[in-house]
Amino acid sequence: MATIRIHDEKNTLIEHQEEVARFLDEQEVIYEQWNIEKLPSELSEKYDLTEDEKERILAVFDTEIQDISARRGYQSQDVISLSDTTPNLDELLKNFQREHHHTDDEVRFIVSGHGIFVIQGKDGTFFDVRLNPGDLISVPENIRHYFTLQEDRRVVAIRIFVTTEGWVPIYENESVQN
């Protein structure tokens, strides 16, 4: 289940699921929980995935992917896996960690591991969304944000896209202050 930390003077923490869902809804960020128990045990917490294993993960969550795609107009999806065994992990993270926005939604479903989206709220204040297996988030178009890994430095996520072009960032000049 996701938690939120607001970058305010109190570093406000939101941990209860109803409050997390309400806060994200107020920010127009889609948040859902999908049944992670559907994932076969041999794919759980596995970070070196073959293309066949990635396709199996997509097949497991096909109903959910098709549902959100029909509601939001998404056209394609893939699986990304990052861990300390990923070649050039630090270089990849530098790209993800640069503040940016997109002209479409950025959608991620966490299959294994953890991730953090840092998002600019409607009032201009940034907040972290710490995601865990089973969490789906959709950052709306044109919202400044970036993604990073948590301390374990590993994640497997389904990425869902509006277009078949996939992840196309528009980088910002200003950086987020934590």
From Swiss-Prot:
Residues the entry annotates as binding Fe(2+): 100, 102, 106, 145
Details of cofactor binding: Binds 1 Fe(2+) cation per monomer. Binds 1 nickel ion per monomer.
Gene Ontology BP annotations: L-methionine salvage from methylthioadenosine; L-methionine salvage from S-adenosylmethionine
Pathway assigned to this chain's UniProt record: Amino-acid biosynthesis; L-methionine biosynthesis via salvage pathway; L-methionine from S-methyl-5-thio-alpha-D-ribose 1-phosphate: step 5/6
Binding site for Ni(2+): 100, 102, 106, 145
Reaction catalysis annotation: 1,2-dihydroxy-5-(methylsulfanyl)pent-1-en-3-one + O2 = 3-(methylsulfanyl)propanoate + CO + formate + 2 H(+); 1,2-dihydroxy-5-(methylsulfanyl)pent-1-en-3-one + O2 = 4-methylsulfanyl-2-oxobutanoate + formate + 2 H(+)
Residues under site feature: Important to generate the dianion: 108
Site (May play a role in transmitting local conformational changes): 105
Matches recorded under InterPro entries: ARD, ARD_bac, RmlC-like_jellyroll, RmlC_Cupin_sf
Site (May play a role in metal incorporation in vivo): 99
Needed cofactors: Fe(2+); Ni(2+)
EC category name: oxidoreductase
Spans through the membrane: none
EC code: 1.13.11.54, 1.13.11.53
Gene Ontology MF term list: acireductone dioxygenase (Ni2+-requiring) activity; acireductone dioxygenase [iron(II)-requiring] activity; iron ion binding; nickel cation binding
Keyword vocabulary terms for this entry: Amino-acid biosynthesis, Dioxygenase, Iron, Metal-binding, Methionine biosynthesis, Nickel, Oxidoreductase
HAMAP family for the chain: Salvage_MtnD
Purpose of the protein: Catalyzes 2 different reactions between oxygen and the acireductone 1,2-dihydroxy-3-keto-5-methylthiopentene (DHK-MTPene) depending upon the metal bound in the active site. Fe-containing acireductone dioxygenase (Fe-ARD) produces formate and 2-keto-4-methylthiobutyrate (KMTB), the alpha-ketoacid precursor of methionine in the methionine recycle pathway. Ni-containing acireductone dioxygenase (Ni-ARD) produces methylthiopropionate, carbon monoxide and formate, and does not lie on the methionine recycle pathway.
Complex formation: Monomer.
Family as reported in the entry's similarity comment: Belongs to the acireductone dioxygenase (ARD) family.
UniProt-recorded name of the protein: Acireductone dioxygenase
Organism per entry: Bacillus velezensis (strain DSM 23117 / BGSC 10A6 / LMG 26770 / FZB42) (Bacillus amyloliquefaciens subsp. plantarum)
